[in-house]
Amino acid sequence: MHCSTWDYAKHLELASAVAERFKPMIFLHSSMQSDYSGSFSFLCFDAYESSSNSFHELNEQLNASKASDSDFFGLLSYELKHELEQLEKSSKGRIQLPKLLMHRYNIVMRFDHQLKTCTVFHRSVDDLNKIPKPNTSGPLQCTLAKLESNMTKSEYLQKVRDILEAIHRGDLYQANLT
């Protein structure tokens, strides 16, 4: 991997321009809202390798890696737990995601929000030409999607009561009701 410096100033606008041009892409934005969220954001695009089946496949790709390869970025779903332990299968949610979806990218940009710097990790010098110009014609316009729950208020409250009872019984110590 090569390493270059880049303009930090318009990182949100740059992420928007990348999203319009590259699929898949990942933007991990710390937004510096609190001490524990870290000081770095990452923008990754121009994928050259993917893994989407299992830990086994990902492990094989990692073992075949060269020092010049970038890291994998992506998602690990809760369903991957079945590759590690014999657990009861949960009901399918409304959003169908792969168990694992990881990509290696030709371009990984790291924004340091404390130092106000941007470091670009890229596989070739030509990759720098792929970085789009950020949209600077005006303020970045963001829209929110319509959010709705998959349960009624009474269903939610009943599930909270069920979780609290399980905690009091000692069946679990923590829950994330989503």
Where are these regions (language model features)?
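Signature of the chorismate-utilizing enzyme
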Residues: 1-178
